[in-house]
Amino acid sequence: MKKIFYVLLVLFVIIVFVKPDIYPVSACENQHPTSLFSDKEASIICIDSKNIYDFNDNDPENIAIPGHLYFPPNIDSPVSLIIISHGAGGIFRFHYDYKDMMLEHGYAVLIIDHFTPRDTIIDFTFKYVTEPMMVSDVINSAKILRTHPRLNGKIGYIGWSKGGIGPILLKNKHLYDKLVYKNDFEFLAGVYTYCGFDIDKENVTDIPMLLISGNKDKITPASYCSELISKLNDENIEYHILADAYHGFDNYAFFFGSYLPWQPVLNANTDKCLLKINPIFQTVNLNDNMDLSSLKNRTRFLDECTSQGAYVQYNSQPSIDAKKILMKFINKHMPN
């Protein structure tokens, strides 16, 4: 009975707090990469992406992913672009608060909908909409928009929670060079994202990175990011741990706080459960006896490396602090 209540509660939150699309996502069905319904300040683009289950997937299906593109008003010269990648709950209204803030500072913003064209509403696991799929969406967006006449070719990449795993993975130079080629990102950023990955400190990109964690976050613990950053010893990584901040501290859908009993909590404190990208671009554990290349394998990994249940809560002060930190970082590394 409790589980039914929590499911109904989540559906209510999604209906109330998820921002309606400016255009229907069905507009991208059977479309080539292009801009549709374009006007002066907003349009939708159809991203020619791939459903890659893991980075070594050699025969992925093509998929058209919608992205909502916004331009700052009253600026006629080309501007820089910030790509936003949502988390496990999809696109929420708070993402649009960040978008509005970035527009006010003169940046264009693309918010990608990773879920709807994949028939997904929420995905609290690594199983259905995988991190390689989301990275593919972002990279292919950058390729399409790099030559847009209203953009200057400079692009930054920010992800929240599940969507922030991509920026972490792209600090791996071996993977970055395979996926991104010469289309450099000006910066990478992750807000309360999962840092349970091992990266060789000799194989790190020099792209500036910002990470922001909450000190009370049990879903994506700050300790995992601290350990990764300590190992990499990379002066290009800026890290902030915010006080009194749970997972989702900037999402007012969690205004009253909520315990999510079904929420998987990944344990990255052993070689069995710490992940890496191997030389053939598989996502594997450090023991090399589990990979994430199939639904079956990912289910096994989750069964063996997760517990369930975590608390989420909005907190206005960390939310304000995160916005200030993020905007200062963007202005420093991608000034208009």
Indicate where each model-derived feature is located.
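N-terminal cap/lid segment of alpha/beta-hydrolase-fold proteins
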Residues: 23-77
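C-terminal catalytic histidine-bearing segment of alpha/beta-hydrolase fold enzymes
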Residues: 236-336
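Short substrate-entry loop that stabilizes the transition state in hydrolases
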Residues: 75-79, 84-121, 196-198, 216-222
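Alpha/beta-hydrolase fold nucleophile elbow
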Residues: 150-161
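Alpha/beta-hydrolase active-site loop
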Residues: 94, 127-149, 169
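Short beta-strand/loop motif that positions the catalytic acidic residue
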Residues: 205, 210-213, 217
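A conserved short beta-strand
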Residues: 177-194
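Short glycine-enriched nucleophile-adjacent loop
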Residues: 146, 164-178
